[in-house]
Amino acid sequence: MSLWLSRWTALHLTGGRVISTPQTEEERWLLSVVERLAKEWGYKTPQLAIYQSPQPNAFATGATRNRSLVAVSSGLLQMMNRDEVEGVIGHEMSHVGNGDMVTMALIQGVLNAFVYVIARAVGRLLSERLDLGALGYWVCFVVLQITFTLLASIVVLYYSRRREYAADAGSARHVGVDKMIAALQKLRHPISTEAPLPKAMNSFGIRESDEKTSIWATHPSIESRIAALRKMS
């Protein structure tokens, strides 16, 4: 259900404005890029939106490849030239083409179910062997669920970082390696301390609000992404 509401939710959280009828030359150009890349990928043209934020960022979301949304921030359009913006749009369109939103939701759902079942089973086993009673069982269950959830998060975040490399590569193949590298280089130094996206949407943006190089990061470092792209050229 959350996937089917994801476009509406994203627009609500960011205040994005859908560009159904372009009013400016910039909007016409943006829509033409999205339409061209959708045709190359072989899926229906996503909704295109612009949201107001001084931070350069963009995101993609949607329940399926043919029911998707690609949005860019006003800060990104002000900071980047057209080649760099095209690289960013190519990255987001790659997420749509690769079905990353659906895969992430499925992985999260399966792991959540796995964590619940295993935590209950192990909690019951421990409470019976140690004669902890009903209260002891629930304490074990809660502690185990928290522990297993943290471990499962490492798996989800690892996949999130891998999909960023894949989206970078997809953009490089469709719009050019140089454009994608140039876009990432611009993202090294955001122009505002404001978080690029609401915290709940960090994993959907092209960059994370707090650049980290750890197992808890949703995105790889900009440097490692650029290095991976340079290996393609």
Q: Residue ranges of each PLM-predicted region?
A:
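Short pre-active-site segment immediately N-terminal to the catalytic Zn-binding motif
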Residues: 19-22, 74-87
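Active-site recognition of the HExxH zinc-binding catalytic motif
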Residues: 7, 34, 72, 87-95, ...
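Conserved catalytic motifs of the protein kinase core domain
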Residues: 67-69, 85
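Juxtamembrane/transmembrane-helix boundary motifs in multi-pass membrane proteins
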Residues: 79, 96-100, 132-140
